[in-house]
Amino acid sequence: MSELIPLSEVGVVNPTSATTNRPRRPEWLKARAPGGVNYHDVLRLMREKNLHTVCEEARCPNIGECWNHRTATFLLLGDICTRGCRYCAIGKGKPKPIDEEEPERVAESVAHLRLKFAVLTSVNRDDVPDGGAHIFARTIELIRQKVPDCKVEVLIPDFDGNWDALAMVLDAEPDVLNHNIETVPRLFRRFRPRAKFEQSIELLARARAAHPHLVTKSGMMVGAGETNEEVYEVIDRLREVDVNVLTIGQYLAPDASYWPVHRYVTPAEFADFRAYALARGFRHVESGPLVRSSYNAHLHVGAAQH
């Protein structure tokens, strides 16, 4: 069994290291050291195909566990984001032109890995009219052609309120439509300066209205300065637009230049969030310190459809 290591050693920097008045990282925030045959097979394939994963770019603490299960979240549209959200480790700036061949390489990788469940996400591409929605749609279509029994989850940006772009993705018929709310309304504009809470809620509502049987999903991070009551209020808002699946995890600052961690939420509090969300009608809830949006994603679609 792999030994437990600090998150900083898998790319998640402990925000207490730069400032002594920030909370000390608790013992329960440990991740397993990445390694193993499957891990290195996935890593090699991503390099060969010149593909990006959010697992690496966002410094996910679960990379070792997920890659050893031969699952990965493909990062479409390059590795440079046009936005500057204060929590995200993905590079910001002027991105390269969209690579129209990327969907083919992703689909080939899904086939090579013999995936039964693929997760597709992307950087924000506010520099192109459809926000890159056509790349999502084409990637879904090619995965369906090459691996017909593979289910597909898309974790999409807000497309800056371009509902035609949303429709383009929905028309490709993903199995799960995920759009993360990320935080509570009070913190939203500081945490995500170029996004709007109500716009994200509207996106999820429109997805449900257009495809009543689609599994919809959202997620948020806690420990960023919100109160537990505000978390419960967001859970209620998401249920109002009939979101099926919810993920809640601990916010971890990539380094001291990002939005600071205000506190470390206890495992007991995460259990309370999960119990409340299930009582409100969510069909599946992942809630825990190391939970990320795509964690155990292959389990969500089946649970949500029952």
Curated annotation (Swiss-Prot):
Transmembrane segments: none annotated. Keywords: 4Fe-4S, Cytoplasm, Iron, Iron-sulfur, Metal-binding, S-adenosyl-L-methionine, Transferase. InterPro entries: Aldolase_TIM, Elp3/MiaA/NifB-like_rSAM, LIAS_N, Lipoyl_synth, rSAM. Its main location: cytoplasm. [4Fe-4S] cluster 1 binds at residues 55, 60, 66, 294. GO terms for cellular component: cytoplasm. Pathway: Protein modification; protein lipoylation via endogenous pathway; protein N(6)-(lipoyl)lysine from octanoyl-[acyl-carrier-protein]: step 2/2. It catalyses: [[Fe-S] cluster scaffold protein carrying a second [4Fe-4S](2+) cluster] + N(6)-octanoyl-L-lysyl-[protein] + 2 oxidized [2Fe-2S]-[ferredoxin] + 2 S-adenosyl-L-methionine + 4 H(+) = [[Fe-S] cluster scaffold protein] + N(6)-[(R)-dihydrolipoyl]-L-lysyl-[protein] + 4 Fe(3+) + 2 hydrogen sulfide + 2 5'-deoxyadenosine + 2 L-methionine + 2 reduced [2Fe-2S]-[ferredoxin]. Residues 67-283 form the Radical SAM core domain. Its EC number is 2.8.1.8. It is found in: Cytoplasm. The keyword Transferase applies. NCBIfam families: lipA (TIGR00510), PRK05481.1 (NF004019), PRK12928.1 (NF009544). This is Lipoyl synthase. It comes from Chloroflexus aggregans (strain MD-66 / DSM 9485).
